[in-house]
Structure formats: structure tokens, C-alpha cells
Amino acid sequence: MREKIKLESSAGTGHFYTTTKNKRANPEKLELKKFDPVARKHVMYKETKLK
């Protein structure tokens, strides 16, 4: 089953993306490089819990 997750910016801007992931196939935490519109550059986004 796919679960909803939050990808939070490592730039400290508070910006985040939401997405889904299959926790059984990928149990480790997700890290992606995505665009942060607040910082106006590409930064690492790390998986956190969606509340």
C-alpha cells in the first residue's frame, strides 16, 4: 500500500512537497534534489512524516 509522505526542504525555508511511496518496496527514507521556490534554487528534500 502506498503511504503519503512529506518531502521537506533542507534549506530551512519551511517549503515542502507531498507525495506517495511504497514503504514495503522502499523502507529507507527518501532524499531527492528538487527546486525550492522560496530559496530560488535546487536543494535536497528529505522525507518526514505527514501529520
Swiss-Prot record:
Family annotation (SUPFAM superfamilies): Zn-binding ribosomal proteins (SSF57829)
One GO term describing the cellular component: cytosolic large ribosomal subunit
Biased composition (Polar residues): 10-20
Disordered as annotated region, ranges: 1-23
Keyword list, A-Z: Ribonucleoprotein, Ribosomal protein
Annotated InterPro entries: Ribosomal_bL33, Ribosomal_bL33_CS, Ribosomal_bL33_sf, Ribosomal_zn-bd
Coiled-coil regions listed in the entry: none
Molecular function (Gene Ontology), one example: structural constituent of ribosome
UniProt GO BP: translation
HAMAP family: Ribosomal_bL33 (MF_00294)
Assigned protein family: Belongs to the bacterial ribosomal protein bL33 family.
PANTHER family, A to Z: 54S RIBOSOMAL PROTEIN L39, MITOCHONDRIAL, LARGE RIBOSOMAL SUBUNIT PROTEIN BL33M
Descriptive protein name: Large ribosomal subunit protein bL33
UniProt source species: Nitrosomonas eutropha (strain DSM 101675 / C91 / Nm57)
